[in-house]
Amino acid sequence: MSHTALHELGAHELLAGYRARTFSPLDVAQAVLAQIERWEPHIAATWLLRPELALAQARTSEARWARGEPCGALDGVPITVKENIATAGDPVPLGTRAVALAPAAADAPPAARVREAGAVIVAKTTMPDYGMLSSGLSTFHAISRNPWDVSRTPGGSSAGAGAAAAAGYGPLHLGTDIGGSIRLPAAWCGIVGLKPSLGRVPIDPPYMGRAAGPMTRDVADAALLMQVLSRPDARDSMALPPQAIDWSLAWRADKPLKGVRIGLLLEAGCGLVVEPAIRVAVEHAAHLFEAQGAVVTPMPPFMTPELLAGLDHFWRMRSMLDLDALAPAARDSVLPVIREWAESARGMSGADVFRAYAATHATRVATNAAMQAFDYVISPVSPNAPAPFDWPSPTNDPLRGLEHIGFTVPFNIGEQPAISVNCGYMDSPGTPGAALPIGLQIAGQRFDDLGVLQMARAFEQLRGPQRAWPAVPGKA
C-alpha cells in the first residue's frame, strides 16, 4: 500500500486496504472529514455535512470488515451525493430557497444503490437554483468555487461534486447531467465525469436527456461506481433493460486502439468559439490515439445555432411553467438570472413551443447520424475556461446562458454515453500563475458505456503524468 494520505486514495486502493486490514473505514472517514474541514471554507462544496452520521456509517462498515462480511462492492468507501438525488429523510432543495424543505420519503435509485453497496455517504453536494446554471450560483447554498483557482467556477450544475472530487473529499461522487452538468464540472475541475447512456443508471424522476453518473479522479473508480449504479430499479420508466456488463474490464483489460474509428470534432457548430489552448490540447489527444493505430478523422459540426436555440427555448418554457406554479414569494426568491431567462418564454405561441420541442428530435437525429461513421467521437467538453465564480454562465448573459454546451448537450438528447477526462492545463484568466484543467470528451455509440470508459482509461495511460491536485489555499 502506498504512503498516499487516506483521503487521496482511490476506491480500489481503499477496498484493498480494508481487505488487508491496513486501515479501516473509520480511519478513512476521519481522514476525509478532516480534508473537508480544511477545504470547505474555501470552496463551499457540501450541504448536509453531518460528521457524526458519516462516522456512524463507517463504524458499522468497520465491524462488517472485521467479521469478514462486507455487504457490497463499495463497503466503507466514502461518497458524496448531489443534493437533487433524494436521500431518505432529507430535504431536496434543488439549490434554491424557493423549494419547501420537506424530507424525502425514500432514497432515489442512485442513492439506494450506493447505500446497498455499503458506501459511506459523507455529505450531499451543492448545485445552483434548479440545476439550471453551469456554476455554483445558488440562493440556497454558498457559492461553490473551483479548487484549482477559487476565483473561478467549478462548473455546474454538479458544482459541489466537481469541487469535492478535485479537493479530495473521498474518491466517489454522484452527479446528474441533462446538458453537461457532470461533464462540465469534471472538465473544469480536472476529474473524470461520465454521463451514461440514457436509462443505463435508473433515476427518479426520469426525464428526456437526464442521467446520473460517477464523478471521480480516475476511470477505474468511475467504472466501479457504474457497477453499482447500473443495477435495475422499477421506478425509472425510461430505464434500459438490465444487462450483464463486466465493468471491471474498464480497469482490468487494455482496449486495443488499432483500427478504432475516431471522429475529431473541434467545432460545435453553435455557441462559443473554442479557445486556442483547448483546441491544442484536444488535437494533442487525437495525435496520441492516432499514434496507437486509431483512425482519426476530422468531422464537421452537426449542431446548428437553430438546434441549440430550439432546445434553449423549450427549456425556457418548461422553466417558466415551473416558476408560475410557485407562490409569489417563492418565485421572487429564485435567482434573477433564471427568472429573466424563463420569463422570456412568456410571449411564445403554441406553435413556437412545438417548434422548440421539435428541435430536440432533430438534435437526436443529427447526433445519431453524425456518429454512424465512427466508433467514438472526441472533442472539447467546453469551448472555454471556467468563468468567474459568481457568474451564472460563461457569457454572464441570462439570454445566452447555453452557448457553451454545444459539445455536451447533443449526447444527452441523442442518448449516447459521453465522458470527460483531463487532457491538459491552461493559464487561468483570473489568477496569474494558476493553471486550470482542460477536459477531453469521448462519446460513444448508444449503450457502449463500457467502451467509452475503456477509451478514457486508454487515454489516461497515454497522456502522461498529471499535475498534483490543488493544495488548500495558504497551505501550499
Where are these predicted regions, by residue range?
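Serine-dependent amide/ester hydrolase catalytic core
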Residues: 13-19, 63, 256, 266, ...
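Acidic/His- and Gly-rich active-site-bordering loop/insert found
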Residues: 54, 64-139
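An N-terminal boundary/leader segment
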Residues: 1-56, 291-293, 468-476
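Short glycine/serine-rich loop segments
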Residues: 106-233, 412-425, 429-441
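A short helix-breaking turn/cap at a secondary-structure junction
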Residues: 195-284, 303, 462-476
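Acyltransferase
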Residues: 22-30, 59, 247-251, 274-300, ...
